[in-house]
Amino acid sequence: MAFNHLPAAMHDALGPLSASPVTHSVPMAKKHRPSRPPESGGSRPSPDMVLDRLAAGAGRSARITHTEHLPPRTGTHAIWPDRIRPEVIAAIQKAGIDHPWAHQAAAAEHALDGESVVIATGTASGKSLAYLAPVLSALLDGSEAPNGRGATALYLAPTKALAADQRRSVKGLAAPLGNGIRPAVYDGDTPVEEREWVRQYANYVLTNPDMLHRGILPSHPRWSSFLRALRYVVIDECHTYRGVFGSHVAQVIRRLRRLCARYGADPVFLLASATAAEPSAAAGRLTGLPVVEVADDASPRGELVFALWEPPLTELHGEKGAPVRRTATAETADLLTDLTVQGVRSVAFVRSRRGAELISVIAKERLAEVDRSLPARVAAYRGGYLPEERRALERALHSGQLLGLAATTALELGIDVSGLDAVVIAGYPGTRASLWQQAGRAGRAGQGALAILVARDDPLDTFLVHHPEALFQQPVESTVLDPDNPYVLAPHLCAAAAELPLTAPDLDLFGPAAAELLPQLETAKLLRKRPSGWHWTRRERAADLTDIRGEGGRPVQIVEEGTGRLLGTVDESAAHTAVHEGAVHLHQGRTYLVRKLDLEDSAALVEEANPPYSTTARDTTAIAVLETDTEIPWGDGRLCYGSVEVTNQVVSFLRRKLITGEVLGETKLDLPPRTLRTRAVWWTVTQDQLDSARINPEILGGALHAAEHASIGMLPLFATCDRWDIGGVSVPLHPDTLLPTVFVYDGHPGGAGFAERAFQTARGWLTATRQAIASCECDAGCPSCIQSPKCGNGNDPLHKRGAVRLLTELLRSAPPDPAGPTTSSAPTTPSASPESPGSPTAP
């Protein structure tokens, strides 16, 4: 029997809205807010004042487990390099910026010297201006060429919204420069009639990696004049290019560099990143080029008050009678409501599209009870909207018409939202880099700001709100990506060959794994070797071999039955869990029921309904070891890393009451299984170790299962992954290892580097896992430690005390981490000896 937990989209069922919370004793952190300073004379309340008002309700102050004060910082000015055109400097000054910050001037100097550079400074530190000054100067020079297009620049953003926002900024900044600067967006929303003008006349093209992969590079002859003059490539928010998506983007960039070379261009790459560990190395992996880093942030910053907020326990009980906390979704909706009533401009960042819609709906309902004019000032912003809906929301946000917004990470990435007072983050976003990026959206223009992290009821969030040093005393993570992943590299070699025949010198550009893959691609009759190089042999488009976001397949369209109206799309990889038959789907505040999921036609038919429940899919998994790459002894057991094959099937879904989260029932589903070949870390335990840990056969399955759930929950603290990027399986007797085994694997074909990171930091990772379980206040396990909302076995069996004893015994003989003591950016945890349980309440 295998117990498993699969990567999937968030399914944060709406928690208890009206149930009375059970107040519990949470001692106020020693570093809690000092006495409130006097409110400033301006109309904008101080962050401390806003937080005090939020905490004023019954039992609310106990929910704040820690408050961190980041003091204001003064800025350091410099002067622009004299090679920047005076007209550009004048345009910048006309925009109200008299002098650059020191990091802006330094980055511009590198760009003018022809050096690729990454600017890794904080949110709102002016990274855009750092690359725009040299880019606009070069474009203005090029506009004086006989054809008016002597220089061009390409801008890559991870989202359409960011590209559209940047175009507005560039157009405004460059207005005094006349027709010398011609910015244009080229993405899936660009009307067909405008595309030819962009190709022939625009000299600053803003797009995304998806369009570069599918639209621009395969049609490079039509872009020849643009590519021939390409001087700069700007890669904005480059820290988001991690995991499988980042690996794909790295190969798309290598294809771009190859075509530029054929047209005689050698563009300089200008990258903008949030504060990150080793930004130069990460940018080098992404581009394949040496990259200089500018990481000393010289911009000023207002005070940031950062509160950690843990929702209270309720009177309700979950699976197996476990105590249940109020959901982060419901708690965030309350906070957004209160902030809107206070007139505080706020954004609530939510992990899932569904969560964003739920928070918006709840906030609107509650605001209507206060003032009927307020619901219109709150909205949801997420991916999957139609282009016209997305643009309308962006206009409302910029105009100030919207006061509160529930947004997914589509808004996290640098869109210029001025005047925000507060940010509420519903659940840890997976990395410290993303956490600080979201928190930094408030307090622009130097004013003070409030950020609140609301903990979800899971092991990692619970650990973090009670261990603030893991957030505030640790550096941000290194970016993990693997361009040599064969599942990533192979389709890009095919795409490159379709663009221009691949030659032997090209292979160095694509990395050492390219030469090994070519014979396999020939055998598969995808490529054919001729004297001029390797050629693409098929009629279909090579660029369609892969979805660079790692989602696979074509999107599933969500269509309203009866009217035929297209509501939006969902990725094929998420369709089995998000739009299965019977699923509840939210769109723009309306609720729909999925009547049919047609996988062949990639369509989900829905009808509007108002069910009093939400739905959560459940799945089961089997795993087989294909190859063990590395293994090291852990006492009598082994820690291994290698290739596995995972078979997953969505088998049912739960219906939960909206108000209480109570499970109403489970409905079986008949969906086909899906197979994934990927990379995994796994560990085994021997009978002697089980005897030492007092693990008898009756509790073995529950102990392994509990350790697996908790270890998945804690891995994002050690690797730059999200919880749904990884999956796990625990087996009391696995047929390949012939021992009790726990697997944790990458949820992407070919792997994404997360399991490898887990192998490298295994001692620290499993020590933190043990501590998270042992320090939880519950008796037999709860969502804060060992229960998982996605468990295909209904969180049964689980044995909390057995998991602690098992991990204690395993760690007793654990060698130092192969990655070394300095590579893990997670907090130091106590020894896992029986005498040092990490908590006086340890079982």
Go through the PLM ranges and name each one.
Residues 776, 781-785:
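Short cysteine clusters
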Residues 55-95, 99-102, 106, 112-118, ...:
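Helicase motor core with emphasis on the C-terminal RecA-like subdomain
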Residues 12-13:
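Short hydrophobic alpha-helical segments enriched in small aliphatic residues
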Residues 7, 28-77:
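Intrinsically disordered, low-complexity accessory regions that flank the conserved helicase/ATPase core
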Residues 807-820:
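Short Fe-S-cluster ligation motifs
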Residues 818-840:
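Intrinsically disordered, low-complexity proline-rich tandem-repeat tracts
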Residues 448-451, 457-472, 482, 492-503, ...:
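Extended Lys/Arg-rich polyanion-binding regions
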